[in-house]
C-alpha cells in the first residue's frame, strides 16, 4: 500500500446526479494502484450507521454529523475518503470542511429534469405526487455550492471525463509542500501536518497520489 496523507473528496449533488457512480469509478482506479481508500455512500450509511434517522433538516444534519466523525477518523489516519451524500445544506458542508483533513468539495451537477429522467426507482415520481415528504429538489431545498473546489456536469461530461476532471483539478489544487487544497477554503491549520505523522516515514503529497493515475 502507498503511504499518503489522508484527504476527503466530498461529492454533493441531487439524487441521480451521479455521485455514487463517479465515486465508485474513482475508487476502483485508486484502489488498483495501492491507495488506502474507503468509500462512504448515503444509501449504505442509511441502512446501518444512521438507519434511525429520517429526512427532516435536523435528521439530515445528524446524518452528516455521524458521517463526518467517520471521515475525520479515517482521513487523519492517512486514509483517502470518498463521501457521496446529497448533503443539501451549505452550512453543513462547511462544517464538514472544518472537521476533516484535506477536504475537497466536488459538486456533481445535473439539472433536476435530467435527474428525474435517470430515476429508475421512481423516487422523484413519488415525491412529486406527494408520497415522499422532504425530498431534496422537490419539497426540500438543495443549496448548490457557490464556489466548489471541483465542479463536474454529468449531463455534459461522460463518466471518464468527470473522473479525469476530478483527478486533474485535485492535482492542480495541491502542491508538494502543503497538505490542503490551494484553491479551497483551508481547514483549521492545527488539524493538519505537512509531514508524515510517523517518524522516519517519507511524506508523500496528495498531488502525487492523484497524479499517478492521471
Swiss-Prot record:
Q: Which domain of life is it from?
A: Bacteria
Q: Locate the active site.
A: 87
If you read the UniProt record, what top EC class would you report for this enzyme, in one word? transferase
Q: Which CDD domains match?
A: APSK
| Biological process terms in GO annotation | hydrogen sulfide biosynthetic process; sulfate assimilation via adenylyl sulfate reduction; sulfate assimilation, phosphoadenylyl sulfate reduction by phosphoadenylyl-sulfate reductase (thioredoxin)
Q: Which UniProt keywords apply?
A: ATP-binding, Kinase, Nucleotide-binding, Phosphoprotein, Transferase
- Statement: the UniProt record of this protein carries the keyword Phosphoprotein: yes
Disordered: annotated segments: 174-199
Query: What is this protein's name?
Result: Probable adenylyl-sulfate kinase
Which organism is this protein's natural source? Answer: Pseudomonas aeruginosa
Amino acid at each position: 500500500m502507498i503511504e499518503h496523507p489522508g484527504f476527503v473528496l466530498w461529492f454533493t449533488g441531487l439524487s441521480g446526479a451521479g455521485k455514487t457512480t463517479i465515486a465508485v469509478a474513482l475508487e476502483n482506479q485508486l484502489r488498483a494502484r495501492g491507495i488506502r481508500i474507503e468509500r462512504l455512500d448515503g444509501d449504505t450509511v442509511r441502512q446501518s450507521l444512521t438507519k434511525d434517522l429520517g429526512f427532516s433538516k435536523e435528521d439530515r444534519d445528524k446524518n452528516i454529523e455521524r458521517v463526518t466523525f467517520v471521515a475525520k477518523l479515517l482521513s487523519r489516519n492517512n486514509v483517502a475518503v470518498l463521501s457521496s451524500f446529497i448533503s443539501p445544506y451549505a452550512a453543513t458542508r462547511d462544517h464538514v470542511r472544518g472537521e476533516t483533513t484535506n477536504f475537497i468539495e466536488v459538486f456533481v451537477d445535473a439539472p433536476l429534469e435530467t435527474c428525474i429522467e435517470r430515476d429508475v426507482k421512481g423516487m422523484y415520481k413519488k415525491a412529486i405526487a406527494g408520497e415522499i415528504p422532504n425530498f431534496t429538489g422537490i419539497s426540500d431545498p438543495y443549496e448548490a455550492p457557490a464556489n466548489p473546489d471541483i465542479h463536474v456536469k454529468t449531463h455534459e461530461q461522460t463518466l471518464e471525463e468527470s473522473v479525469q476532471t476530478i483527478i486533474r483539478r485535485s492535482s492542480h489544487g495541491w502542491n508538494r509542500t502543503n497538505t490542503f487544497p490551494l484553491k479551497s477554503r483551508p481547514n483549521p491549520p492545527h488539524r493538519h501536518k505537512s509531514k508524515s505523522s510517523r517518524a522516519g516515514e517519507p511524506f508523500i503529497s496528495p498531488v502525487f497520489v492523484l497524479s499517478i493515475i492521471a
